[in-house]
Regions:
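Short, helix-capping/interhelical loops that line the mouth of catalytic, cofactor-
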Residues: 1-52, 56, 100
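Short, contiguous alpha-helical
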Residues: 1-15, 62-117, 157
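C-terminal interaction segments
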Residues: 10, 14, 21, 145-212
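Charged/polar, low-hydrophobicity segments characteristic of intrinsically disordered regions
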Residues: 18-33, 110-125, 186-204
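Amphipathic alpha-helix face/heptad-repeat signature
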Residues: 35-42, 71-75, 103, 146
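Internal, glycine-rich beta/alpha segment that forms the wall or movable "lid"
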Residues: 55-63
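Short helix-capping/linker segments at secondary-structure and domain boundaries
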Residues: 88-94, 119, 162-170
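Glycine/small-residue-rich hydrophobic helix-like segments
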Residues: 118-161
């Protein structure tokens, strides 16, 4: 089934369609509530399948194959990141939870990818990352004596590496040239290099704007 979908999507992409447009044929004109119900039902099935999967099992995807564990983390990241767009559009402040640690870890793990994907030389040393979790715990990656560091809220770090916020719209403290460069190009997802949103362009719309 996946091989068929992959073949169709690849063919549409070769014809110049966007990834979004390439999905229309197999969605069979589903939209609105019907599309949501299809997505929700399939997400439950996917959750059950992942719960019983061997974490090391290799899974095919539109990009390179990945382990089930990596695929689970990637799906969580994508759902969280695109979900932020919904919170922003509806003017709802999101409540963060410590499950966001998986996304922060993926952000750190893709440090090298953020540079390689743009044809840039990967720095020898990864910055020290010290984040405050939603529950108040301290999460750390890297060596605390590193000349470069990133410190701040875990939720804001996740927003930057998933490119739902410009780093200048957060209170993350980036020290050192490597850390500052990384936060300008951070990309924890696969695909061609994507630029983060422009400063001030992504935010949660104030509720009063809805006139209700």
């Amino acid at each position: 089934e996946f091989a068929k979908i992959y073949s169709n999507v690849s063919s549409h992409l070769d014809q110049g369609m966007s990834l979004l447009e390439s999905q229309y044929p197999f969605l069979n004109e589903l939209s609105g509530k019907n599309l949501f119900e299809r997505w929700y039902g399939n997400s439950r099935k996917l959750g059950v399948a992942f719960a019983h999967a061997d974490p090391s099992m290799r899974l095919k995807w539109f990009g390179p194959e990945m382990s089930a564990k990596s695929s689970i983390t990637a799906r969580q990241m994508e759902t969280w990141a695109h979900g932020q767009e919904i919170f922003d559009a509806l003017g709802v402040k999101r409540t963060a939870h410590d499950r966001i640690k998986n996304i922060c870890h993926l952000g750190v793990a893709t440090f090298g990818w953020s540079f390689t994907n743009r044809g840039l030389k990967v720095p020898h040393h990864i910055p020290y990352v010290r984040l405050i979790s939603p529950s108040g715990q301290i999460w750390e990656w890297g060596d605390s004596v590193s000349p470069s560091s990133i410190k701040g809220k875990a939720s804001e770090f996740a927003e930057v590496v998933t490119q739902v916020r410009n780093v200048q719209d957060t209170r993350l403290a980036s020290e050192g040239a490597i850390a500052k460069k990384w936060m300008k190009i951070a990309q924890c997802f696969a695909g061609k290099p994507e630029n983060p949103p422009a400063k001030g362009s992504r935010f949660t719309v104030p509720r009063e704007n809805f006139g209700v």
